[in-house]
């Protein structure tokens, strides 16, 4: 629109969720209109994040090191493992401030229509995890979408013989809802009232 470089900046900003053409243009103009220091700081933070944030080799969430701060925290309850779809779900549960166990991030959910099957997720690693480091309970905290429900059922069957108890977070979360978009109170209650 203005220049080729400006158009490229707008195009790159549009890859962010919820950012359309107009919002991307406003963001670009905001950064270029006397806030170039903020733009440079943003670019540097993005560069560092893209190169230095890695996947925790234990839970598969994001980490600055091989093992994330949650996995190395000795105050966490090793007997309970909460299985979620994404690192965003870990953040949502942590912000609800009611869960003190460990996590395991699947890396998505089963979706045959999109060509995503069990081999594309961290399900084998989850089964190996509960075989080598047994837990008393697995909490299945996948989304309440059809794909999330299917994933929860598949995991329950895969781990049932290796775990004392497999539970699902309580219903009451809106059908079709994504965990990362729930308010903290709803998510906290769902974890406390799991069945």
Curated annotation (Swiss-Prot):
The function of this protein is: May play a role in DNA repair. It seems to be involved in an RecBC-independent recombinational process of DNA repair. It may act with RecF and RecO.
Which BP terms does GO give this entry? DNA recombination; DNA repair
According to the entry, every stretch annotated as the Toprim domain falls at: 79-174
Query: Residue ranges of the C4-type zinc fingers?
Result: 56-71
What's the family? Belongs to the RecR family.
- Tell me which species this is from: Psychrobacter sp. (strain PRwf-1)
Protein origin, superkingdom? Bacteria
InterPro entries in alphabetical order = DNA_Rcmb_RecR, Rcmb_RecR, Rcmb_RecR_Znf, TOPRIM_dom, TOPRIM_RecR
Q: What protein is this chain from?
A: Recombination protein RecR
* Coiled coil region boundaries: none
Keyword annotations of the record: DNA damage, DNA recombination, DNA repair, Metal-binding, Zinc, Zinc-finger
Question: Which Gene Ontology molecular-function terms are recorded?
Answer: DNA binding; zinc ion binding
């Amino acid at each position: 629109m203005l220049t080729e470089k400006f158009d490229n900046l707008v195009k790159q900003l549009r890859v962010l969720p919820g950012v359309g053409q107009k919002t991307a243009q406003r963001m670009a103009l905001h950064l270029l209109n006397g806030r170039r220091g903020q733009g440079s700081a943003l670019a540097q933070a993005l560069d560092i994040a893209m190169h230095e944030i890695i996947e925790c080799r234990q839970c598969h969430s994001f980490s600055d090191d091989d093992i994330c701060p949650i996995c190395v925290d000795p105050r966490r309850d090793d007997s309970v493992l909460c299985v979620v779809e994404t690192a965003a779900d870990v953040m949502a549960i942590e912000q609800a401030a009611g869960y003190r166990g460990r996590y395991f991030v699947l890396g998505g959910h089963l979706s045959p229509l999109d060509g995503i099957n069990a081999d594309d997720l961290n399900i084998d690693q989850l089964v190996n995890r509960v075989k080598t480091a047994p837990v008393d309970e697995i909490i299945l905290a996948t989304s309440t979408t059809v794909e999330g429900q299917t994933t929860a059922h598949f995991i329950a069957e895969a781990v049932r013989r290796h775990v004392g108890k497999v539970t699902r977070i309580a219903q009451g979360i809106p059908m079709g809802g994504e965990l990362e978009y729930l308010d903290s109170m709803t998510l906290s209650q769902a974890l406390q009232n799991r069945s």
